Amino acid sequence: MGLDMYLYGVKQEFHKHDYNIGGYKESTEIGYWRKANAVHAWFVECCQNGVDNCATYYVGHEDLKALRDRCEDVLLEPERAEELLPTQDGFFFGTTEYDDWYFDDIKETIEICKWALAQDFDYFEYHSSW
């Protein structure tokens, strides 16, 4: 058990000529974190309106850019990590220390965001469970 976090890239297609058919949504898992509670706290605050309920939430391109930028700021000023991207405690959420594990999660988040933003997804979705 523990905090598992997923980012999905979504392509959405609508049938323009037959509105009775609607369309489809294709989701692809493009990011996974385990117990990266600071990143999870950012998604809860910025994309989930503060609601932490293991549901799936919309994430826009601008949201991912903001997360990427915040993580880059943390790496540039690690002494401000607690202010810029604070950890979050919780049952099964892992450590709240600003240690090598924390900074590895930050680096991984930057890579996930960069890759995701370079793709042709219409939007993204974030889901967590514990």
Residue ranges and their predicted role:
Residues 1-130:
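Acidic (Asp/Glu-rich) sequence patches and key acidic residues
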